[in-house]
Swiss-Prot record:
It comes from Synechococcus sp. (strain JA-2-3B'a(2-13)) (Cyanobacteria bacterium Yellowstone B-Prime). This is 1-(5-phosphoribosyl)-5-[(5-phosphoribosylamino)methylideneamino] imidazole-4-carboxamide isomerase. It catalyses: 1-(5-phospho-beta-D-ribosyl)-5-[(5-phospho-beta-D-ribosylamino)methylideneamino]imidazole-4-carboxamide = 5-[(5-phospho-1-deoxy-D-ribulos-1-ylimino)methylamino]-1-(5-phospho-beta-D-ribosyl)imidazole-4-carboxamide. It is found in: Cytoplasm. One of its GO terms (biological process) is L-tryptophan biosynthetic process.
Length: 261
C-alpha cells in the first residue's frame, strides 16, 4: 500500500488581471470575477490567517508571454513573511532571475516547459530547487499560453520530461475543474503521481473539506491550491488548515479507502 501524506500544504491563490485580484471559470478570461479590492491587503489577510505560502499568478503575463504585474508582485512579496510562488509569463532565464531577485521563493513555468525545454533545463541548473512546472490540462492534454492553446502532449508525459530536466516540483491544474468547486480530478492526479518523482501540488475544483481529505489520501501529493473555495466562503482557510495542514485534527473518513485503487 502506498503511503499517504501526513499533511498537505494549503496554499491560497491570488490571480492578477489588470492589477485586480480575480478568479476565472474554467480558464475563461471573459468570465473573470473580481474577488478582492486590493491584492496586497488580501495577501496580508491570508498570511495573517495562517497560510504557509501564497500562490500568485500573473494572468496578463500568461497571455502576453511576459510578466505584467511585477510592481504588485513585488509589493506582495515585500509585505509578507511567508514564501510566495509566482507563475504567469515566465519564459526566459532573465525573467526568472528578476522575480527571484525580488524575493519570490519559487517561479512556476508552464509554456516554457513545453515550447523551450533547453531554457527550462538552463533555468533549473541556474536556480536549483526553485523552478517548478505548472502543468495545466484539458482532458489530460497540456494547455499553454495562458490556457488559450491546447497541445497533443499528455500531462504524465510532460511530468516525466520536466523532472528529468531538473524541475523541483509540479503544480497540476485540471482546467475543466478550475473555478467550479466540482472537486479535483482524482483519476488524473493519480496518473500524475504514478510517474512523478518530485513533489506535486493539486489545483482546480477543490470545493469542500471532503475534497481536501480525498487529496490527503493520494500518495506523494504535498499541497493543494485554493482559490474560489476560499473567496466564496465554501471553505475557510482555518478549517482547511485544521483538516489537512500540520497538526490536523480530522482523520480520513473510511470511504476514502476507495481512492487507493
Amino acid at each position: 500500500m502506498p503511503y499517504t501524506s501526513a499533511f498537505l500544504e494549503v496554499i491560497p491563490a491570488i490571480d492578477l488581471l489588470q492589477g485586480r485580484a480575480v478568479r476565472l471559470y474554467q480558464g475563461d478570461y471573459a468570465q473573470a470575477e473580481q474577488v478582492a479590492d486590493d491584492p496586497i491587503q488580501q495577501a496580508e489577510a491570508w498570511a495573517a490567517q495562517g497560510a504557509p505560502r501564497l500562490h500568485v499568478v500573473d494572468l496578463d503575463g500568461a497571455k502576453s508571454g511576459d510578466p505584467v504585474n511585477l510592481p504588485i508582485i513585488e509589493r506582495i512579496v515585500r509585505s509578507l513573511a511567508i514564501p510566495v510562488q509566482v507563475g504567469g509569463g515566465i519564459r526566459s532565464l532573465e525573467r526568472a532571475r528578476q522575480l527571484l531577485d525580488l524575493g519570490v521563493d519559487r517561479v512556476i513555468v508552464g509554456t516554457l516547459a513545453v515550447e523551450d525545454p533547453d531554457t527550462l533545463e538552463a533555468m533549473t541548473q541556474a536556480f536549483p530547487g526553485r523552478v517548478w512546472v505548472g502543468i495545466d490540462a484539458r482532458q489530460g492534454q497540456v494547455a499553454t499560453r495562458g490556457w488559450l492553446s491546447t497541445t497533443p502532449l499528455r500531462a504524465p508525459e510532460l511530468v516525466q520530461r520536466v523532472q528529468a530536466q531538473g524541475a523541483a516540483g509540479i503544480i497540476y491544474t485540471d482546467i475543466s475543474r478550475d473555478g467550479t468547486l466540482a472537486g479535483p480530478n482524482l483519476e488524473q492526479l493519480r496518473q500524475i503521481l504514478a510517474v512523478s518523482q518530485v513533489p506535486v501540488i493539486a489545483s482546480g475544483g477543490i470545493g469542500s473539506l471532503t475534497d481536501l481529505l480525498a487529496l490527503l489520501s493520494l500518495p506523494r501529493l504535498t499541497g493543494a491550491i485554493l482559490g474560489k473555495a476560499l473567496y466564496s466562503g465554501a471553505i475557510s482557510l482555518q478549517e482547511a488548515l485544521r483538516a489537512v495542514g500540520p497538526g490536523r485534527w480530522q482523520d480520513l473518513p473510511p470511504e476514502t479507502g476507495s481512492l487507493w485503487a
